Curated annotation (Swiss-Prot):
GO biological process: translation
InterPro entries xref list: Ribosomal_bL35, Ribosomal_bL35-like, Ribosomal_bL35_CS, Ribosomal_bL35_sf
Record-given protein name: Large ribosomal subunit protein bL35
Domain of life: Bacteria
Keyword Glycosyltransferase: no
NCBIfam families cross-referenced by the UniProt entry: rpmI_bact
PROSITE patterns: RIBOSOMAL_L35
Entry's Gene Ontology molecular function annotations: structural constituent of ribosome
Length: 65
């Protein structure tokens, strides 16, 4: 059986932490920022984690991560 391939788009967007969780960046921070408050923009700089329900899907996309 051939090797499985990682989904390259997902591989660029997620990193695995030491505990095995998947770390991600927040969305909605690239443009149309004038109407967003400084507090909102500051919170968008922080990272987030993939939810438990989505982790199973991500394991299929990233078998070697």
């Amino acid at each position: 059986m051939p090797k499985m391939k990682s989904h390259r788009g997902a591989a660029k967007r997620f990193k695995k932490t030491g505990t095995g969780k998947l770390k991600r960046a927040k969305a909605f921070k690239s443009h149309i920022l004038t109407k967003k408050s400084p507090k909102t923009k500051r919170n968008l700089r922080k990272g987030g984690y993939v939810s438990k329900s989505q982790e199973k899907v991500m394991k299929k996309l990233l078998p070697y991560l």
